[in-house]
Amino acid sequence: MKSLFNEKEARAFVGKYGSLPEALSLRLYTSRLIGKNSNLVLHGGGNTSVKLKTKNILGEDQEIVYVKGSGIDLATIEPEGLVGMDLSPLRRLRTLQAISDEDMDNQLKIRKTNALSPDPSVEALLHAFLPPRYVDHSHADSILVLTHLKDGEVHLREALGPRVGILPYIHSGLPLAKAVAEIYERIGAVEAIVVLYHGIFTFGDDVRTSYERMIEYVSRAESYIKKRCAGKSPVIHRKKIKPLKDHRSSASRMVNVIRGTCAFPAADGSLQRWYTVVRDGTEMKDISRSEEAEGMCGSGVLTPDHTIRTKNRAVYLREVSEDDEELRKKVSQSVNQFKTAYDHTFSEQVKKKRIAREKLDPYPRVFLAAGIGLVTVGMTREAARVAADIAEHTLMAKLRAKGVGEYLPISDSDVFDMEYWSLQQKKLGKTVPPLLQGQVAVITGGGGAIGLGIAEQLLAHGAAVVLCDIDAARLKKVHSILSTKYGDSNLEQATFDVTDFKSLDQAFAEISRRLGGIDLLVPNAGIAHVARIEDLAPEKFDQVMAVNLKGTFNVIKASVPVFRRQGTGGNIVVISSKNVFDPGAAFGAYSASKAAAHQLSKVAALELAELGVRVNMVNPDAIFGDAEVSSRLWELVGPERMKSRGLDPEGLREYYRQRNLLKARVLAEHVGNAVVFFASDQTPTTGATLPVDGGVPAAFPR
């Protein structure tokens, strides 16, 4: 590992944050250097601090310690992420023999110099007790590898040298802070302190020294491990492992089943669904097929901090069956075994510790599947990604540890204390989840005005959305509009032709592989052609039928195996048309195709109810879109209708507004609201038609 400290960059940081004290700007700079190195910290892990002398509001001298806020990501930390606290009263806490979690939390909060700052890191007292101006802390993989080895302290001393203090694992808070301060004072010229199963602390009176000591000692650990592993085969594959016929298809099927097996009723009665992440690179696939795979899954986290993201252990799937029923049986069996073990550990720990705790959900977050690789689940896509990053680093670290010596896991007691520590749980937050969080929504015709309106409402309510269209340019434009407003984390896109079942089926498999499955399908792709029957070319009729009828058939058909494997129900909301009940002259192909698709959707409602899948239809009318994204249908029919009525574009919009009973201008977002209603399962409804047209009497469902 090399130092990335650059004087020019450091000066640029000082200039960028010119209103801050220089020491604080430099603290931000090296904090980001640490945060951007995933071999040092992952997703909010690690922490840094700096001590400054300043004036308080009364003009009195005051020493402040700025510590990274709890859960703040070092990679992107801003000034607000460093929490300033009055140092003197914090240091006096060192005289205490013990302090409750609640009292420590309160002491940290009342010492903040800005009441609106986030909560400081749980390591804040440790940073306060250490005398050096700068303190850096990381969960470096290579350091943790050595701490997990039998005779770990011996390995650490040989690897790191004499100027490093080594402590056994101590729970974060006052006990660890006092122990670190004591060993710092006891050892002369100490440059770093390692806490077993926890990580490494480095320090210095200037920012570069503290940072580069971190890099230096982590580099020593890496070199030591590399030397010990030289010439050894990292992975020994299991014998007689059945090869997969189609890796990507197997991965898609498997995540559907995992996702469904792990779904459970939430406190509000809704179904808690999951997103998945698949890591199937060469290294993860090799480990999944190895003799050590099952043992790695059972040997726990690298550091107790990780347990709130990944649980302590992972599930190992020795085989991914080509038969869906057999696959579901094996996954269900493995998940139930995990839950039973989790429940047993929880009961055992609360009994031994004589405490009362509310049990968290017992579902696994990490799976290792033979031949597939790593799969993680999360209640948000970000949570699934975080779990995947941590699990991937954990598996690689355990593989390296194998080459050095015997790997020793952390005790269940220590992991339990961290998982059920109230101050650690705060990192996860307690906010009420959005209405559709956990759902994957697939929208065809995603490049048009209605597709945009539907996607926007689904994203606003927390769903992950996959925009699908045959027109890549229009799809890209809609994606850009939505990502600007909502970001990319819950937004995906796929390009395919709904009339081509094979490519569509492959696209749905890829959507499953990327997100876990499908909960909401919105068949919205459609085309139109204006011609009286006498003038309507048969091939044009066939073309409209192919997209509007066969396309609807294809997407519904392709979704059924996904819904079946998940076993958690779902919704199909077909974007139909006012023309189903109120057709127009010279619009025969469109009206007939929409009416046929509408009838097909009713049949789907009859057939899919046994899977818990509801099928409903939305009948919009006169959705024009806007200047950014127009309606393709109105691009086609609008000119002829303006001409026949002597209207300009705005006049045509007004004509259709005045035509409906409510005199309402119907927008794409109104269609989106209807889709959200059906997707949220607020009523036990299937086979229904919901007009979104302002009230057109001739189009009343009947």
Report each predicted region and the residues it spans:
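Glycine-rich flexible loops
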Residues: 1-441, 453
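Short, small/polar-rich loop/turn modules that mediate ligand/substrate recognition or access, typified
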Residues: 522, 609, 614, 685-687
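Active-site helix of classical SDR
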Residues: 556, 593, 601
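Alpha-helical segment proximal to the catalytic Tyr-Lys
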Residues: 561, 606-607
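Substrate-binding pocket helix/loop in short-chain dehydrogenase/reductase
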Residues: 532-533, 540-542, 656
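Residue(s) in the substrate-gating loop at a strand-loop-helix junction
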Residues: 577
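C-terminal substrate-recognition "lid" of short-chain dehydrogenase/reductases
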Residues: 664-692, 697
